[in-house]
UniProtKB/Swiss-Prot annotation:
Positions of heme b b562 binding: 83, 182
Family to which the UniProt record says this protein belongs: Belongs to the cytochrome b family.
Primary gene name: MT-CYB
Designated name of the protein: Cytochrome b
Entry note: cofactor: Binds 2 heme b groups non-covalently.
Length: 379
């Protein structure tokens, strides 16, 4: 008798994706972040669903409804903080997942990589709109500042901003539409994840050596299901430690003050996971230039397959590229730090230098290092 999981039209798909999937035998813990991102998305959708049952997207009651969730709803505080800190965990996993892709040359899977970049953009948009919903000071002013960036677009900018706002300032219409988009986008992300996996399973996973591993494959279950289970356990432990011991660690105290259009906070800054891009935006004195740099700082990821000049796929055996890669990581930490600092000396110049270094490494230094390494191979 044939096995149901191999013949049933629906179960067969799951079987080919998570059970009998041939996987390289040498993939390290860096390959755990895909499943962890799936877990984060699931947590965010579930906690978000329960929050949406009690939240009201009206400027008069939004802040009070969040307070009501935390004070009066059974375990509302837990759901709210799991959702807020779950977003931080989501971005930690995202950055590590992208970093792994850059280090081991996974971007050579062109379609998978580009859908991944679209997923990153969609997640950033979702997180931004979610930050506006509690309608605290930083929510309101963050929404005002970031949406206002679109006014830098020539000719249609101002009209576009007012169209997004639904009026002449960030108000009730803006909050309502942000809530609607914040609710629907995670489901669009989930659909894109399936397409991301579809393209990945066309080629199979990359591995640390960057070599073709067709001759040495093992079944996904039980080897990688148990490995993913360990990663999931560690992620949940980290998330719950953050939620139960220091839930406001990564938040902004200003967001505990209800939104007031007449009082601007001294330092407007986004959540920590956007600070690197915010620093790049602020480092350019021109508004349109800053917006273009901001968009390009993420969009530049799509250029990696074109800028890959090395004869080897992975950085595993390329010490020069490894060194430059870690300088890039340090530069991103520097940008994140600068994004949270006030706009004054010496932070302005540090931010500008870090921004120049960021684009230089990706567009110039890494490809040059690859060519040098190619030459060294011939010696």
């Amino acid at each position: 008798m044939t096995n149901t999981r191999k013949t049933h039209p629906l179960i067969k798909i799951i079987n080919h994706s998570f059970i009998d999937l041939p996987a390289p035998s040498n993939i390290s813990a860096w390959w755990n972040f895909g499943s962890l991102l799936g877990l984060c998305l699931t947590i965010q959708i579930l906690t978000g669903l329960f929050l949406a049952m009690h939240y009201t997207s009206d400027t008069m009651t939004a802040f009070s409804s969040v307070t009501h969730i935390c004070r009066d709803v059974n375990y509302g505080w837990l759901i709210r903080y799991m959702h807020a800190n779950g977003a931080s965990m989501f971005f930690i996993c995202l950055f590590l997942h992208v970093g792994r892709g850059l280090y081991y040359g996974s971007y050579t899977y062109f379609e998978t990589w580009n859908i991944g970049v679209i997923l990153l953009f969609a997640t950033m948009a979702t997180a931004f709109m979610g930050y506006v919903l509690p309608w605290g000071q930083m929510s309101f002013w963050g929404a005002t500042v970031i949406t206002n960036l679109l006014s830098a677009i020539p000719y249609i900018g101002t009209t576009l901003v007012e169209w997004i706002w639904g009026g002449f300032s960030v108000d009730k219409a803006t909050l309502t539409r942000f809530f609607a988009f914040h609710f629907i986008l995670p489901f669009i992300i989930a659909a894109l994840v399936x397409v991301h996996l579809l393209f990945l399973h066309e080629t199979g996973s990359n591995n640390p050596s960057g070599l073709v591993s067709d001759s040495d494959k093992i079944p996904f279950h039980p080897y990688y299901t148990i490995k993913d289970a360990l990663g999931i356990l560690l992620l949940i432990m980290a998330l719950m430690t953050l939620v139960l011991f220091s839930p406001d660690l990564l938040g902004d105290p200003d967001n505990y003050t209800p939104a007031n259009p007449l009082s601007t906070p001294p330092h407007i800054k986004p959540e920590w996971y956007f600070l690197f891009a915010y620093a790049i935006l602020r480092s350019i004195p021109n508004k349109l230039g800053g917006v273009l740099a901001l968009v390009f700082s993420i969009l530049i990821l799509t250029l990696f397959p074109l800028l890959h000049l090395s004869k080897q796929r992975s950085m595993m055996f390329r010490p020069l590229s490894q060194c430059i890669f870690w300088i890039l990581v340090a530069d991103l930490f520097t940008l994140t730090w600068i994004g949270g600092q006030p706009v004054e000396y010496p932070f302005i110049i540090i931010g500008q230098l870090a921004s120049i270094l960021y684009f230089s490494i990706i567009l110039l230094i890494l490809p040059t290092a690859s060519l040098i390494e190619n030459k060294l191979l011939k010696w």
